[in-house]
């Protein structure tokens, strides 16, 4: 008799995705981040669900309800900090996952890659709206500044901003709708992740060499299930260490002050994972130009497959491209640092140079270098 997992309509899907899936025999630790992102999403949905049971999305009580969760709810402080720092772990895994895709040419799977870019936008939107919910100073002013950027859109801008706010400023209506969206988006993200996997399993996984691995496949279980479990344990170790030893390390002290529309914080800045995009936004003196650069800094990922000029898929055997890739990583770290600094000399010029280099590397320097490497193959 055939095994039930191979015949049952539901178990058959799980079996073909996580058990009998033919996987390349040489995929490295960089391929662990997909499963880690799945774990992060589950952690966020579960902790978020328990937080939503005690949270109230009203400007008068939101801040107090978060305080109540931390002080009076059983292990409320743990749930709250797991959720807040879980977002940071989520973004660390996301950035490493995208970086892996860029390095090893995984973007050649167009549908998988484009859904991944869409997922990145969805996760960023969710995180932004979640940051508004505690209704601290940085929540309020972050929401005001970022939503105000839409006013740069010609003709419909100011109407659009008021429509999103549900009034003439960030207020009760804004908080309520942000909570509603913050609650529903993770489930949309989960559905998109399912589609992401569906398209990935159509073509099969890429591998470090960038060559076809059809001749050398191994079953996903037990080889990669055990490898993924190790990754998950390390992720949980990192997350719990952060939560139990320094839960406020990545947060902003201003967010422990109740939102006050009459008092602007000296430095308005988003969470650390948005700082690189925020630095690009600030480096352009024009409002509309800044907004376009902000959107393009992420949207540029969708263009990457069309800029692939190399005869090789992966960067594994392309030393010049490798060098440029790590320059790009250093550039993004520089932008992250600049995003957290005040708008003054020398940070302004460093931010502008780093922003120009970011776009130049992806759009011009890397494709040209790939062409040069193609010529090296002939020698």
Swiss-Prot record:
Annotated heme b b566 binding sites: 97, 196
Q: Name one GO molecular function term.
A: metal ion binding
Going by the entry's taxonomy, the superkingdom of the source organism is recorded as Eukaryota
Give an example GO biological process: mitochondrial electron transport, ubiquinol to cytochrome c
Q: Where does a ubiquinone bind?
A: 201
The residue ranges crossing the membrane are 33-53, 77-98, 113-133, 178-198, 226-246, 288-308, 320-340, 347-367
Query: Topologically, how does it sit relative to the membrane?
Result: Multi-pass membrane protein
CDD domains noted in UniProt: cytochrome_b_C (cd00290), Cytochrome_b_N (cd00284)
Record-linked Gene3D superfamilies: Cytochrome Bc1 Complex, Chain C
Q: What keywords are assigned to this protein?
A: Electron transport, Heme, Iron, Membrane, Metal-binding, Mitochondrion, Mitochondrion inner membrane, Respiratory chain, Transmembrane, Transmembrane helix, Transport, Ubiquinone
Record: residues binding heme b b562: 83, 182
Where does the record say this protein resides? Mitochondrion inner membrane
Provide the Gene Ontology terms for cellular component.
mitochondrial inner membrane; respiratory chain complex III
Essential cofactor(s): heme b
Taken from the UniProt record, the cysteine pairs bridged by disulfide bonds within this chain are none
State its role: Component of the ubiquinol-cytochrome c reductase complex (complex III or cytochrome b-c1 complex) that is part of the mitochondrial respiratory chain. The b-c1 complex mediates electron transfer from ubiquinol to cytochrome c. Contributes to the generation of a proton gradient across the mitochondrial membrane that is then used for ATP synthesis.
Query: Assembly and partners?
Result: The cytochrome bc1 complex contains 11 subunits: 3 respiratory subunits (MT-CYB, CYC1 and UQCRFS1), 2 core proteins (UQCRC1 and UQCRC2) and 6 low-molecular weight proteins (UQCRH/QCR6, UQCRB/QCR7, UQCRQ/QCR8, UQCR10/QCR9, UQCR11/QCR10 and a cleavage product of UQCRFS1). This cytochrome bc1 complex then forms a dimer.
Name the family the entry cites: Belongs to the cytochrome b family.
**This protein's name:** Cytochrome b
Q: Which species is this UniProt entry from?
A: Sorex tundrensis (Tundra shrew)
Its taxonomic placement starts with:
Eukaryota, Metazoa, Chordata, Craniata, Vertebrata
């Amino acid at each position: 008799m055939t095994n039930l997992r191979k015949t049952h309509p539901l178990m058959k899907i799980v079996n073909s995705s996580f058990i009998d899936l033919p996987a390349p025999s040489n995929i490295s630790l960089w391929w662990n981040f997909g499963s880690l992102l799945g774990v992060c999403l589950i952690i966020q949905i579960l902790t978020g669900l328990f937080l939503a049971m005690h949270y109230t999305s009203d400007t008068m009580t939101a801040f107090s309800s978060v305080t109540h969760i931390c002080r009076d709810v059983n292990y409320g402080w743990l749930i709250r900090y797991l959720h807040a720092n879980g977002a940071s772990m989520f973004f660390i895994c996301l950035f490493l996952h995208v970086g892996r895709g860029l390095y090893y040419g995984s973007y050649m799977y167009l549908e998988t890659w484009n859904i991944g870019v869409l997922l990145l936008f969805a996760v960023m939107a969710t995180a932004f709206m979640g940051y508004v919910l505690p209704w601290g100073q940085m929540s309020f002013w972050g929401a005001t500044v970022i939503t105000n950027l839409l006013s740069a859109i010609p003709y419909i801008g100011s109407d659009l901003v008021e429509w999103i706010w549900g009034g003439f400023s960030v207020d009760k209506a804004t908080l309520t709708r942000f909570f509603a969206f913050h609650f529903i988006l993770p489930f949309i993200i989960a559905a998109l992740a399912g589609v992401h996997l569906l398209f990935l399993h159509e073509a099969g996984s890429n591998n470090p060499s960038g060559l076809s691995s059809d001749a050398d496949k191994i079953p996903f279980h037990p080889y990669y299930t055990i490898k993924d479990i190790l990754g998950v344990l390390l992720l949980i170790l990192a997350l719990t260490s952060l939560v139990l030893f320094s839960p406020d390390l990545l947060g902003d002290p201003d967010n422990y002050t109740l939102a006050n529309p009459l008092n602007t914080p000296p430095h308005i800045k988003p969470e650390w994972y948005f700082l690189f995009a925020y630095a690009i936004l600030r480096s352009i003196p024009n409002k509309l130009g800044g907004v376009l650069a902000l959107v393009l800094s992420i949207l540029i990922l969708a263009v990457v497959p069309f800029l692939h000029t190399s005869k090789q898929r992966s960067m594994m055997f392309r030393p010049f491209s490798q060098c440029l890739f790590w320059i790009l990583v250093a550039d993004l770290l520089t932008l992250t640092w600049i995003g957290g600094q005040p708008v003054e000399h020398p940070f302004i010029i460093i931010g502008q140079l780093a922003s120009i280099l970011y776009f130049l590397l992806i759009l011009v320097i890397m494709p040209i270098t790939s062409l040069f490497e193609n010529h090296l193959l002939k020698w």
